[in-house]
Protein backbone atom coordinates (compact mmCIF):
# COMPACT_ATOMS: atom_id res chain seq x y z
CA UNK A 1 0.00 0.00 0.00
CA UNK A 2 2.84 2.38 0.85
CA UNK A 3 4.51 1.68 -2.52
CA UNK A 4 1.22 2.40 -4.31
CA UNK A 5 0.85 5.69 -2.41
CA UNK A 6 4.39 6.74 -3.34
CA UNK A 7 3.71 5.88 -6.98
CA UNK A 8 0.54 8.00 -6.98
CA UNK A 9 2.41 10.94 -5.47
CA UNK A 10 5.16 10.68 -8.09
CA UNK A 11 2.59 10.60 -10.88
CA UNK A 12 0.85 13.66 -9.44
CA UNK A 13 4.14 15.55 -9.34
CA UNK A 14 4.95 14.55 -12.92
CA UNK A 15 1.53 15.72 -14.12
CA UNK A 16 1.99 18.99 -12.26
CA UNK A 17 5.27 19.62 -14.04
CA UNK A 18 3.80 18.89 -17.45
CA UNK A 19 0.93 21.27 -16.75
CA UNK A 20 3.39 23.93 -15.64
CA UNK A 21 5.36 23.69 -18.87
CA UNK A 22 2.15 23.77 -20.94
CA UNK A 23 0.46 26.63 -19.11
CA UNK A 24 3.27 28.84 -17.90
CA UNK A 25 1.81 31.77 -19.82
CA UNK A 26 -0.59 32.30 -16.93
CA UNK A 27 2.10 32.19 -14.28
CA UNK A 28 4.57 34.72 -12.92
CA UNK A 29 3.12 37.47 -15.10
CA UNK A 30 5.30 40.56 -14.96
CA UNK A 31 8.52 38.68 -14.05
CA UNK A 32 10.32 38.46 -17.31
CA UNK A 33 7.60 36.56 -19.17
CA UNK A 34 6.84 37.25 -22.77
CA UNK A 35 3.26 36.90 -24.05
CA UNK A 36 4.23 33.61 -25.64
CA UNK A 37 6.35 30.94 -24.01
CA UNK A 38 7.19 29.30 -27.31
CA UNK A 39 10.50 31.18 -27.40
CA UNK A 40 11.48 30.58 -23.76
CA UNK A 41 14.67 28.62 -23.20
CA UNK A 42 14.16 25.01 -22.05
CA UNK A 43 15.88 25.64 -18.73
CA UNK A 44 13.54 28.57 -18.03
CA UNK A 45 10.52 26.35 -18.67
CA UNK A 46 11.86 23.65 -16.34
CA UNK A 47 12.50 26.28 -13.67
CA UNK A 48 8.85 27.29 -14.07
CA UNK A 49 7.88 23.70 -13.31
CA UNK A 50 9.87 23.93 -10.09
CA UNK A 51 7.96 27.09 -9.18
CA UNK A 52 4.68 25.39 -10.00
CA UNK A 53 5.55 22.26 -8.02
CA UNK A 54 7.56 22.37 -4.76
CA UNK A 55 7.50 26.16 -4.45
CA UNK A 56 3.73 26.38 -4.96
CA UNK A 57 3.21 23.62 -2.38
CA UNK A 58 5.50 25.40 0.09
CA UNK A 59 3.60 28.67 -0.40
CA UNK A 60 0.24 26.92 0.00
CA UNK A 61 1.15 25.26 3.31
CA UNK A 62 2.88 28.41 4.58
CA UNK A 63 -0.33 30.33 3.95
CA UNK A 64 -2.27 27.72 5.92
CA UNK A 65 0.14 28.05 8.85
CA UNK A 66 -0.01 31.83 8.52
CA UNK A 67 1.76 34.46 10.60
CA UNK A 68 5.52 34.85 10.33
CA UNK A 69 5.86 31.67 8.25
CA UNK A 70 3.55 33.07 5.56
CA UNK A 71 5.37 36.43 5.47
CA UNK A 72 8.72 34.66 5.24
CA UNK A 73 7.47 32.45 2.42
CA UNK A 74 6.39 35.48 0.40
CA UNK A 75 9.92 36.88 0.71
CA UNK A 76 11.36 33.57 -0.49
CA UNK A 77 8.92 33.61 -3.42
CA UNK A 78 10.12 37.07 -4.41
CA UNK A 79 13.73 35.84 -4.36
CA UNK A 80 12.85 32.90 -6.62
CA UNK A 81 11.06 35.19 -9.07
CA UNK A 82 14.10 37.46 -9.17
CA UNK A 83 16.19 34.38 -9.90
CA UNK A 84 13.83 33.47 -12.73
CA UNK A 85 14.33 36.94 -14.21
CA UNK A 86 18.09 36.32 -14.16
CA UNK A 87 17.61 32.97 -15.90
CA UNK A 88 15.57 34.66 -18.63
CA UNK A 89 18.34 37.23 -19.03
CA UNK A 90 21.04 34.55 -19.21
CA UNK A 91 19.08 32.65 -21.86
CA UNK A 92 18.92 35.74 -24.09
CA UNK A 93 22.20 37.55 -23.41
CA UNK A 94 25.91 36.94 -23.15
CA UNK A 95 27.63 36.98 -19.77
CA UNK A 96 28.86 40.46 -18.77
CA UNK A 97 32.11 41.35 -17.04
CA UNK A 98 32.41 40.59 -13.34
CA UNK A 99 31.69 44.15 -12.22
CA UNK A 100 28.51 44.26 -14.31
CA UNK A 101 27.50 40.77 -13.21
CA UNK A 102 27.50 41.90 -9.59
CA UNK A 103 24.95 44.57 -10.54
CA UNK A 104 22.69 41.90 -12.04
CA UNK A 105 22.98 39.79 -8.90
CA UNK A 106 22.33 42.70 -6.53
CA UNK A 107 18.50 42.33 -6.38
CA UNK A 108 18.82 38.64 -5.45
CA UNK A 109 21.47 39.45 -2.85
CA UNK A 110 19.28 42.13 -1.28
CA UNK A 111 16.34 39.73 -1.11
CA UNK A 112 18.49 37.12 0.62
CA UNK A 113 19.48 39.73 3.21
CA UNK A 114 15.82 40.62 3.75
CA UNK A 115 14.92 36.99 4.44
CA UNK A 116 17.77 36.64 6.95
CA UNK A 117 16.95 39.95 8.65
CA UNK A 118 13.32 38.91 9.10
CA UNK A 119 14.45 35.93 11.18
CA UNK A 120 16.73 38.12 13.30
CA UNK A 121 13.92 40.59 14.00
CA UNK A 122 11.53 37.83 15.08
CA UNK A 123 13.57 35.78 17.52
CA UNK A 124 10.64 35.71 19.92
CA UNK A 125 8.39 34.07 17.33
CA UNK A 126 6.69 30.79 18.27
CA UNK A 127 7.69 29.56 14.82
CA UNK A 128 11.34 30.52 15.18
CA UNK A 129 12.58 27.10 14.04
CA UNK A 130 10.63 27.52 10.78
CA UNK A 131 12.17 30.95 10.24
CA UNK A 132 15.64 29.64 11.07
CA UNK A 133 15.35 26.76 8.60
CA UNK A 134 14.59 29.23 5.81
CA UNK A 135 17.14 31.81 6.94
CA UNK A 136 19.98 29.28 7.13
CA UNK A 137 19.34 27.94 3.62
CA UNK A 138 18.09 30.92 1.59
CA UNK A 139 21.65 31.65 0.45
CA UNK A 140 21.20 28.69 -1.88
CA UNK A 141 19.75 31.29 -4.28
CA UNK A 142 23.34 32.45 -4.70
CA UNK A 143 24.18 29.36 -6.78
CA UNK A 144 23.98 31.56 -9.88
CA UNK A 145 27.30 33.12 -8.82
CA UNK A 146 28.98 29.83 -7.91
CA UNK A 147 31.34 28.10 -10.32
CA UNK A 148 32.35 25.44 -11.06
CA UNK A 149 30.20 23.53 -8.52
CA UNK A 150 26.87 25.28 -7.87
CA UNK A 151 25.06 22.01 -7.14
CA UNK A 152 27.12 21.02 -4.06
CA UNK A 153 26.71 24.58 -2.77
CA UNK A 154 22.92 24.21 -2.80
CA UNK A 155 23.23 20.86 -1.02
CA UNK A 156 25.32 22.49 1.69
CA UNK A 157 22.62 25.10 2.26
CA UNK A 158 19.96 22.38 2.31
CA UNK A 159 21.90 20.51 4.98
CA UNK A 160 22.05 23.68 7.07
CA UNK A 161 18.25 23.93 6.93
CA UNK A 162 17.82 20.36 8.13
CA UNK A 163 19.29 21.21 11.52
CA UNK A 164 16.16 23.29 12.18
CA UNK A 165 13.64 21.30 10.16
CA UNK A 166 14.49 18.29 12.32
CA UNK A 167 13.48 20.34 15.32
CA UNK A 168 10.21 21.27 13.62
CA UNK A 169 9.54 17.59 12.93
CA UNK A 170 10.34 16.66 16.51
CA UNK A 171 7.99 19.34 17.83
CA UNK A 172 5.03 18.77 15.50
CA UNK A 173 5.18 15.19 14.22
CA UNK A 174 2.57 14.03 16.75
CA UNK A 175 0.77 17.36 17.03
CA UNK A 176 0.10 18.90 13.61
CA UNK A 177 0.87 17.08 10.33
CA UNK A 178 0.65 20.39 8.48
CA UNK A 179 4.09 21.38 9.80
CA UNK A 180 5.53 18.02 8.75
CA UNK A 181 4.22 18.63 5.22
CA UNK A 182 5.71 22.13 5.36
CA UNK A 183 9.16 20.65 6.05
CA UNK A 184 8.84 18.19 3.16
CA UNK A 185 7.69 20.90 0.74
CA UNK A 186 10.41 23.35 1.72
CA UNK A 187 13.30 20.88 1.57
CA UNK A 188 12.05 19.55 -1.76
CA UNK A 189 12.64 23.02 -3.27
CA UNK A 190 16.37 22.66 -2.76
CA UNK A 191 16.59 18.98 -3.72
CA UNK A 192 14.69 19.74 -6.95
CA UNK A 193 16.95 22.73 -7.54
CA UNK A 194 20.02 20.51 -7.20
CA UNK A 195 18.66 18.17 -9.89
CA UNK A 196 17.81 21.18 -12.07
CA UNK A 197 21.34 22.58 -11.75
CA UNK A 198 22.90 19.20 -12.50
CA UNK A 199 20.92 19.00 -15.75
CA UNK A 200 21.30 22.55 -17.07
CA UNK A 201 23.99 24.44 -15.12
CA UNK A 202 26.47 21.78 -13.96
CA UNK A 203 29.53 24.04 -13.84
CA UNK A 204 27.76 27.37 -13.41
CA UNK A 205 24.97 29.51 -14.80
CA UNK A 206 24.66 28.82 -18.55
CA UNK A 207 24.70 32.06 -20.55
CA UNK A 208 23.73 32.52 -24.18
CA UNK A 209 26.56 32.48 -26.73
CA UNK A 210 24.73 35.02 -28.88
CA UNK A 211 22.77 38.18 -28.32
CA UNK A 212 23.80 41.37 -26.55
CA UNK A 213 25.87 41.47 -23.38
CA UNK A 214 23.55 41.49 -20.37
CA UNK A 215 23.04 44.90 -18.78
CA UNK A 216 19.91 44.46 -16.66
CA UNK A 217 17.47 41.76 -15.66
CA UNK A 218 14.77 41.00 -18.18
CA UNK A 219 11.48 41.92 -16.54
CA UNK A 220 12.17 42.62 -12.90
CA UNK A 221 9.18 42.35 -10.53
CA UNK A 222 7.23 45.55 -10.88
CA UNK A 223 5.89 47.31 -7.81
CA UNK A 224 2.26 48.42 -7.45
CA UNK A 225 3.12 51.99 -8.30
CA UNK A 226 5.43 51.21 -11.17
CA UNK A 227 3.47 53.32 -13.66
CA UNK A 228 2.70 56.30 -11.46
CA UNK A 229 6.14 57.91 -11.39
CA UNK A 230 7.27 60.64 -13.81
CA UNK A 231 9.16 59.57 -16.90
CA UNK A 232 12.94 59.52 -16.63
CA UNK A 233 14.76 62.69 -17.64
CA UNK A 234 15.94 62.88 -21.24
CA UNK A 235 19.53 61.85 -21.87
CA UNK A 236 22.16 64.54 -21.74
CA UNK A 237 23.83 66.00 -24.83
CA UNK A 238 26.24 63.71 -26.63
CA UNK A 239 29.95 64.21 -25.91
CA UNK A 240 31.88 66.48 -28.28
CA UNK A 241 33.34 64.69 -31.29
CA UNK A 242 36.84 63.41 -30.82
CA UNK A 243 39.42 65.32 -32.82
CA UNK A 244 40.81 63.22 -35.65
CA UNK A 245 44.00 65.26 -35.89
CA UNK A 246 45.35 63.83 -32.65
CA UNK A 247 44.80 60.34 -34.02
CA UNK A 248 46.67 61.13 -37.25
CA UNK A 249 49.52 62.81 -35.30
CA UNK A 250 49.78 59.77 -33.06
CA UNK A 251 49.87 57.49 -36.11
CA UNK A 252 52.60 59.59 -37.71
CA UNK A 253 54.69 59.55 -34.52
CA UNK A 254 54.32 55.80 -34.29
CA UNK A 255 55.46 55.40 -37.94
CA UNK A 256 58.50 57.57 -37.28
CA UNK A 257 59.38 55.52 -34.21
CA UNK A 258 59.27 52.24 -36.16
CA UNK A 259 61.34 53.80 -38.92
CA UNK A 260 64.06 54.66 -36.40
CA UNK A 261 63.97 51.18 -34.88
CA UNK A 262 64.36 49.62 -38.34
CA UNK A 263 67.69 51.46 -38.80
CA UNK A 264 69.33 48.78 -36.67
CA UNK A 265 72.87 49.51 -35.46
CA UNK A 266 73.15 52.61 -37.66
CA UNK A 267 70.82 54.42 -35.26
CA UNK A 268 73.81 54.91 -32.91
CA UNK A 269 75.53 57.15 -35.48
CA UNK A 270 73.22 59.99 -34.46
CA UNK A 271 74.30 59.81 -30.81
CA UNK A 272 76.60 62.53 -29.46
CA UNK A 273 79.80 61.75 -27.59
CA UNK A 274 79.59 62.64 -23.86
CA UNK A 275 82.92 63.90 -22.50
CA UNK A 276 84.03 63.53 -18.85
CA UNK A 277 83.25 67.17 -18.02
CA UNK A 278 79.59 66.50 -18.99
CA UNK A 279 79.23 63.52 -16.62
CA UNK A 280 77.95 64.27 -13.11
CA UNK A 281 79.95 61.45 -11.50
CA UNK A 282 83.15 62.84 -13.09
CA UNK A 283 82.36 66.53 -12.52
CA UNK A 284 81.11 67.30 -8.93
CA UNK A 285 80.51 70.95 -9.82
CA UNK A 286 77.97 69.92 -12.44
CA UNK A 287 76.18 67.74 -9.87
CA UNK A 288 75.94 70.67 -7.46
CA UNK A 289 74.43 72.89 -10.16
CA UNK A 290 71.71 70.39 -11.01
CA UNK A 291 70.21 70.42 -7.47
CA UNK A 292 68.95 67.42 -5.55
CA UNK A 293 68.06 64.32 -7.48
CA UNK A 294 64.37 63.61 -7.89
CA UNK A 295 63.18 60.46 -6.24
CA UNK A 296 61.51 57.79 -8.32
CA UNK A 297 57.89 56.88 -8.02
CA UNK A 298 56.83 55.23 -4.79
CA UNK A 299 55.77 51.60 -4.93
CA UNK A 300 52.07 50.97 -5.20
CA UNK A 301 50.13 50.64 -1.98
CA UNK A 302 46.43 50.09 -1.53
CA UNK A 303 44.60 53.34 -0.80
CA UNK A 304 43.67 53.77 2.82
CA UNK A 305 39.99 54.29 3.49
CA UNK A 306 39.13 57.84 4.37
CA UNK A 307 38.12 58.38 7.95
CA UNK A 308 34.90 60.21 8.44
CA UNK A 309 35.20 63.49 10.30
CA UNK A 310 31.86 63.08 11.99
CA UNK A 311 31.80 60.60 14.88
CA UNK A 312 29.96 57.36 14.27
CA UNK A 313 26.66 57.05 16.12
CA UNK A 314 26.83 54.76 19.10
CA UNK A 315 25.38 51.31 18.57
CA UNK A 316 21.95 51.09 20.12
CA UNK A 317 22.08 48.84 23.15
CA UNK A 318 19.19 46.45 23.44
CA UNK A 319 17.46 46.30 26.84
CA UNK A 320 18.31 43.42 29.13
CA UNK A 321 15.50 40.87 29.50
CA UNK A 322 14.77 38.23 32.13
CA UNK A 323 11.11 37.23 32.00
CA UNK A 324 8.71 34.35 31.53
CA UNK A 325 6.74 34.69 28.28
CA UNK A 326 4.13 31.97 28.13
CA UNK A 327 6.16 28.82 28.64
CA UNK A 328 9.47 30.36 27.55
CA UNK A 329 12.02 31.95 29.87
CA UNK A 330 13.71 34.76 27.93
CA UNK A 331 17.19 35.79 29.08
CA UNK A 332 18.53 38.35 26.61
CA UNK A 333 21.21 41.05 26.33
CA UNK A 334 22.62 40.52 29.81
CA UNK A 335 26.16 41.86 30.27
CA UNK A 336 28.57 41.46 33.19
CA UNK A 337 25.93 39.98 35.50
CA UNK A 338 27.03 37.23 37.85
CA UNK A 339 23.98 36.39 39.96
CA UNK A 340 21.09 35.61 37.60
CA UNK A 341 18.81 32.88 38.94
CA UNK A 342 15.63 31.28 37.58
CA UNK A 343 13.81 29.40 40.32
CA UNK A 344 10.11 28.90 39.61
CA UNK A 345 10.43 26.39 36.79
CA UNK A 346 8.05 23.79 35.43
CA UNK A 347 8.55 20.70 33.31
CA UNK A 348 6.86 22.23 30.23
CA UNK A 349 8.93 25.41 30.26
CA UNK A 350 11.92 26.15 28.04
CA UNK A 351 14.74 28.68 28.41
CA UNK A 352 16.12 30.80 25.58
CA UNK A 353 19.37 32.63 26.38
CA UNK A 354 20.39 35.17 23.72
CA UNK A 355 23.27 37.65 23.36
CA UNK A 356 24.50 37.43 26.93
CA UNK A 357 28.12 38.43 27.58
CA UNK A 358 30.28 37.73 30.64
CA UNK A 359 27.25 36.51 32.55
CA UNK A 360 26.44 33.56 34.81
CA UNK A 361 22.97 32.05 35.06
CA UNK A 362 21.58 29.34 37.31
CA UNK A 363 18.37 27.49 36.45
CA UNK A 364 16.88 25.53 39.32
CA UNK A 365 14.42 22.67 39.10
CA UNK A 366 13.45 20.56 36.11
CA UNK A 367 12.90 22.21 32.71
CA UNK A 368 12.11 20.96 29.20
CA UNK A 369 15.01 22.42 27.19
CA UNK A 370 17.62 25.18 27.15
CA UNK A 371 18.97 27.09 24.12
CA UNK A 372 22.09 29.26 24.30
CA UNK A 373 22.32 31.47 21.21
CA UNK A 374 24.97 34.04 20.27
CA UNK A 375 26.48 34.31 23.75
CA UNK A 376 30.08 35.03 24.79
CA UNK A 377 31.75 34.06 28.06
CA UNK A 378 28.56 32.63 29.51
CA UNK A 379 28.46 30.39 32.56
CA UNK A 380 25.32 28.23 32.83
CA UNK A 381 24.45 25.95 35.75
CA UNK A 382 21.23 23.93 35.70
CA UNK A 383 19.65 21.08 37.61
CA UNK A 384 17.68 18.84 35.24
CA UNK A 385 16.68 19.04 31.57
CA UNK A 386 14.38 16.40 30.09
CA UNK A 387 15.02 17.35 26.45
CA UNK A 388 18.13 19.00 25.04
CA UNK A 389 20.62 21.72 25.91
CA UNK A 390 21.70 23.46 22.72
CA UNK A 391 24.62 25.87 22.32
CA UNK A 392 24.72 27.65 18.94
CA UNK A 393 26.66 30.57 17.43
CA UNK A 394 28.48 31.17 20.71
CA UNK A 395 32.00 31.30 22.13
CA UNK A 396 33.76 30.52 25.41
CA UNK A 397 30.71 28.96 27.04
CA UNK A 398 30.73 26.81 30.16
CA UNK A 399 27.73 24.68 31.11
CA UNK A 400 27.39 22.48 34.17
CA UNK A 401 24.64 19.98 34.87
CA UNK A 402 23.95 19.23 38.52
CA UNK A 403 21.34 16.56 37.85
CA UNK A 404 20.58 14.84 34.54
CA UNK A 405 20.44 15.80 30.87
CA UNK A 406 20.08 13.38 27.91
CA UNK A 407 21.67 15.48 25.13
CA UNK A 408 23.96 18.48 24.75
CA UNK A 409 24.18 19.90 21.21
CA UNK A 410 27.04 22.21 20.22
CA UNK A 411 26.75 23.94 16.84
CA UNK A 412 28.83 26.75 15.29
CA UNK A 413 30.56 27.43 18.60
CA UNK A 414 34.23 28.10 19.38
CA UNK A 415 35.04 27.15 22.94
CA UNK A 416 32.66 25.08 25.06
CA UNK A 417 33.26 23.28 28.37
CA UNK A 418 30.54 20.84 29.48
CA UNK A 419 30.75 19.73 33.12
CA UNK A 420 28.78 16.53 33.66
CA UNK A 421 27.43 15.16 36.92
CA UNK A 422 27.63 11.52 37.98
CA UNK A 423 23.97 11.11 36.99
CA UNK A 424 24.54 12.45 33.47
CA UNK A 425 27.54 10.40 32.35
CA UNK A 426 25.36 8.78 29.67
CA UNK A 427 24.67 12.20 28.10
CA UNK A 428 25.10 12.38 24.31
CA UNK A 429 27.34 15.18 23.02
CA UNK A 430 26.37 16.15 19.45
CA UNK A 431 28.64 18.69 17.73
CA UNK A 432 28.88 20.36 14.32
CA UNK A 433 31.05 23.15 12.90
CA UNK A 434 32.57 23.80 16.34
CA UNK A 435 36.02 23.84 17.94
CA UNK A 436 37.75 23.79 21.33
CA UNK A 437 35.12 21.58 22.94
CA UNK A 438 35.85 19.74 26.17
CA UNK A 439 33.80 17.40 28.35
CA UNK A 440 34.70 17.29 32.03
CA UNK A 441 33.99 14.08 33.95
CA UNK A 442 33.75 14.12 37.78
CA UNK A 443 36.20 12.07 39.85
CA UNK A 444 35.79 10.45 43.25
CA UNK A 445 37.75 13.27 44.84
CA UNK A 446 35.36 15.94 43.58
CA UNK A 447 37.63 17.19 40.80
CA UNK A 448 37.10 16.88 37.04
CA UNK A 449 39.06 15.12 34.33
CA UNK A 450 39.01 16.97 31.02
CA UNK A 451 38.49 15.16 27.71
CA UNK A 452 38.59 17.02 24.36
CA UNK A 453 35.87 16.37 21.80
CA UNK A 454 37.40 15.28 18.45
CA UNK A 455 37.45 17.91 15.71
CA UNK A 456 39.38 16.15 12.93
CA UNK A 457 38.18 13.06 11.10
CA UNK A 458 39.32 10.70 8.37
CA UNK A 459 36.87 9.26 5.83
CA UNK A 460 37.59 6.26 3.59
CA UNK A 461 35.60 4.28 1.03
CA UNK A 462 35.58 0.58 1.98
CA UNK A 463 34.03 -0.61 -1.27
CA UNK A 464 30.44 -0.34 -0.07
CA UNK A 465 30.13 2.81 2.02
CA UNK A 466 32.07 5.69 3.55
CA UNK A 467 33.70 4.93 6.89
CA UNK A 468 34.64 7.87 9.12
CA UNK A 469 37.02 7.60 12.06
CA UNK A 470 38.57 10.09 14.45
CA UNK A 471 42.06 11.26 13.50
CA UNK A 472 44.49 11.20 16.39
CA UNK A 473 47.02 14.02 16.29
CA UNK A 474 50.26 13.51 18.17
CA UNK A 475 51.33 16.78 19.70
UniProtKB/Swiss-Prot annotation:
Example GO biological process: actin filament organization
Keywords per UniProt: Acetylation, Actin-binding, Cell membrane, Isopeptide bond, Membrane, Methylation, Phosphoprotein, Ubl conjugation
PROSITE patterns hit by this protein: C_CAP_COFACTOR_C, CAP_1, CAP_2
Start-end of Pro residues biased regions: 229-242
Residues annotated with Phosphotyrosine modification: 31
Keyword Cell membrane among record annotations: yes
GO cellular component, one term: plasma membrane
Cell location: Cell membrane
Nucleotide-binding found in the keyword field: no
Molecular function terms, GO-annotated: actin binding; adenylate cyclase binding
Region of interest (Disordered), residue spans: 216-255, 278-318
Residues with Phosphothreonine modification: 307
SUPFAM superfamilies referenced in this protein's UniProt entry, alphabetically: C-terminal domain of adenylylcyclase associated protein, N-terminal domain of adenylylcyclase associated protein, CAP
Modified residues (N-acetylalanine): 2
C-CAP/cofactor C-like domain segment(s): 313-453
PTM sites of type N6-methyllysine: 287
Glycyl lysine isopeptide (Lys-Gly) (interchain with G-Cter in SUMO1) crosslink, residue number(s): 348
InterPro entries: Adenylate_cyclase-assoc_CAP, Adenylate_cyclase-assoc_CAP_C, Adenylate_cyclase-assoc_CAP_N, C-CAP_CF_C-like, CAP/MinC_C, CAP_C_sf, CAP_CS_C, CAP_CS_N
Compositionally biased spans, kind Low complexity: 218-228, 243-255
Modified residues (Phosphoserine): 34, 290, 295, 301, 308, 310
Residues bearing the modification N6-acetyllysine: 81
UniProt-listed PANTHER family: ADENYLYL CYCLASE-ASSOCIATED PROTEIN, ADENYLYL CYCLASE-ASSOCIATED PROTEIN 1
Subunit structure, interactors included: Homodimer. Binds actin monomers.
Physiological role: Directly regulates filament dynamics and has been implicated in a number of complex developmental and morphological processes, including mRNA localization and the establishment of cell polarity.
The family this protein is said to belong to: Belongs to the CAP family.
Protein name: Adenylyl cyclase-associated protein 1
Species per Swiss-Prot/TrEMBL record: Pongo abelii (Sumatran orangutan)
Amino acid sequence: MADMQNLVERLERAVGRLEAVSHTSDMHRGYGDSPSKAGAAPYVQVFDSLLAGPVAEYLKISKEIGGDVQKHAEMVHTGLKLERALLVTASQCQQPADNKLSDLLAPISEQIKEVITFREKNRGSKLFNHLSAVSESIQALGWVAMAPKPGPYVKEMNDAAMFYTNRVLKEYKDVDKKHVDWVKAYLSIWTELQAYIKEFHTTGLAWSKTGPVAKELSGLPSGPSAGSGPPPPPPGPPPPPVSTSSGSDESASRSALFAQINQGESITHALKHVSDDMKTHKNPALKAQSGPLRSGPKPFSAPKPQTSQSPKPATKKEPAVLELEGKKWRVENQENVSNLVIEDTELKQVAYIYKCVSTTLQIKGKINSITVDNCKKLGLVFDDVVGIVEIINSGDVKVQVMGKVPTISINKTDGCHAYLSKNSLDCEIVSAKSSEMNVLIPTEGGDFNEFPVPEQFKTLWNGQKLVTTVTEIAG
